[in-house]
Amino acid sequence: MTQVNEMEIELKEPLIPVEEYLAAGVHIGTQQKSEDMKKFIYRVRGDGLYILDIRETDARIKTVAKFLTQYEAPEILVVTSRQYGQYPAKKFADTIGAMSATGRFIPGLLTNPVLDGYIEPKVIVVTDPIGDAQVINEAVQCGIPVVALCDTNNMTKFVDLVIPTNNKGRKALSMIYFLLTREMLRIRGIATSLTQEDFETEI
């Protein structure tokens, strides 16, 4: 068993050691817990913070990578309005060859064909269902599946695949997008020398 700070768990063939997940703060949730995210929560800390189960995070990254590689890269749209998510999300999109929309999402981008910049992705990846609610609503209208990085407080009603993670921290977001990139490239048989630091914003 590996015991570091928050957890005493063992991962089978993890993408990275448990210690690296913990160092990036991937497991640190919020002081709110949604019913939807209950199954991904490991425990609650003395200070009221809910802690996510890294085993679920690791498994879901693998599942999402397999799911996304079923699509052609240009059919994938990666969206984030969250500040710390913008750099790693765009790095992920650029590396795998996907489309990206960072910052404020333009209403109608998926639903209004006459809008300049209108796009028709086959699948969408969002950093936070709260901040990225507009694109999720449009995806639902269009029948486009949604993959979302979800924290302990998120609702997942319109999310098809959840990656449970701290979706607010800079290091956590860079770690998740790095691992997702690396795993997708591995499945495609593409070698990479990228590291987590390559996905970390300098802000």
Curated annotation (Swiss-Prot):
Molecular function as annotated in GO: structural constituent of ribosome
A GO biological-process term: translation
Chain ranges passing through the membrane: none
Keywords: Ribonucleoprotein, Ribosomal protein
Classification via PANTHER family: 40S RIBOSOMAL PROTEIN SA (PTHR11489)
Family per record: Belongs to the universal ribosomal protein uS2 family.
Name assigned to this protein: Small ribosomal subunit protein uS2
Gene coding for it: rps2
